Amino acid sequence: MANKGPSYGMSREVQSKIEKKYDEELEERLVEWIVMQCGPDVGRPDRGRLGFQVWLKNGVILSKLVNSLYPDGSKPVKVPENPPSMVFKQMEQVAQFLKAAEDYGVTKTDMFQTVDLFEGKDLAAVQRTLMALGSLAVTKNDGHYRGDPNWFMKKAQEHKREFTESQLQEGKHVIGLQMGSNRGASQAGMTGYGRPRQIIS
């Protein structure tokens, strides 16, 4: 907030480490995706962390982003006609985005806190949330994602296998590799090593 002073000592070190996690290349990719997903009317931010924060701070662009991943008629977040100017309304808009992102499938561990964006505490966490949202959109592949699919990693998906009863029976007769092998080198034809012990009395 406006009345929060600069941090010193240990707090400054912690804040500095958090700020180093912010990725400017990732910022460019996320801006490209948001503009492609929401349309050019969302504009573009000034380069850098402060521009990125100011661009997303009121929650309207984030709300448009998550709404664009749903089919028409089932948009989860109500986007106001005019961007909210009151602080609590902006924070409420961001909170609605976070709720919609969680409903979409983003895990709690990938979510940022509202203050991370609003006060600029941890913009890397904001990037993480947007990356997780993009990855889910690419993975779902339901036709609502717009942009380059290579911008985000596809999440691993379950791949169930069905076996017939005869295949399961055959599997019981296979010696697992953990048991060792019954082929290859053996001790057949080997004689004892060395000479026998000579005991002379």
Curated annotation (Swiss-Prot):
GO terms for biological process: epithelial cell differentiation. Calponin-like repeats lie at residues 175-200. One of its GO terms (molecular function) is actin binding. Gene3D superfamilies: Calponin-like domain. The modification N6-acetyllysine is found at K172. The modification Phosphoserine is found at S166, S181. The modification N-acetylalanine is found at A2. Keywords: Acetylation, Actin-binding, Cytoplasm, Methylation, Muscle protein, Phosphoprotein. Belongs to the calponin family. Residues 24-137 form the Calponin-homology (CH) domain. This is Transgelin. InterPro entries: Calponin-like (IPR050606), Calponin_repeat (IPR000557), CH_dom (IPR001715), CH_dom_sf (IPR036872), SM22_calponin (IPR003096). One of its GO terms (cellular component) is cytoplasm.
